[in-house]
Amino acid sequence: MPKEIILPEGTPPPLAPYVPATKADNIVYVSGILPLDENNDVVHVGDAAAQTRHVLETIKHILSNAGGSLKDVTFNHIFLRDWADYPAINQVYAEYFPEERPARYCVQVGLVKPDALIEIASVAHV
């Protein structure tokens, strides 16, 4: 099965040996996206809602480059640093997925960047 590497312009360089997304058989696998700028610095430090918005906008950009959109997302893997941020994250998340929401799970973890409050990885069928 051939795969296509998705490297959208403007996304930060990966922090490890991975790519922002791969596409195979019309399925796009988006790597865990952190709230990072083009220099891999965390944006909106301390603001879970703004970080969530940044992450979802990045995922939207990646999916667009793969020929899809957020409407094509079938599963999200959500990693958050603190359960106290869960309501703010969900409020923003609901704006991006108002109807026909994808399946998801959400777990509390330590993230690779200490100031990051959220990371989301997605699967989309385009």
UniProtKB/Swiss-Prot annotation:
Q: Name one GO cellular component term.
A: cytosol
Against CDD domains, the record matches this protein to: YjgF_YER057c_UK114_family (cd00448)
Give the matching InterPro entries: RutC (IPR019898), RutC-like_sf (IPR035959), YjgF/YER057c/UK114 (IPR006175)
Q: Name one GO molecular function term.
A: deaminase activity
Q: What is its EC number?
A: 3.5.-.-
Q: What GO biological process terms are annotated to this protein in UniProt?
A: nitrogen utilization; uracil catabolic process
PANTHER family, alphabetically? Answer: 2-IMINOBUTANOATE/2-IMINOPROPANOATE DEAMINASE RIDA, PROTEIN HMF1-RELATED
Describe its function.
Involved in pyrimidine catabolism. Catalyzes the deamination of 3-aminoacrylate to malonic semialdehyde, a reaction that can also occur spontaneously. RutC may facilitate the reaction and modulate the metabolic fitness, rather than catalyzing essential functions.
Put simply, this protein is called 3-aminoacrylate deaminase RutC
- The primary gene name is rutC
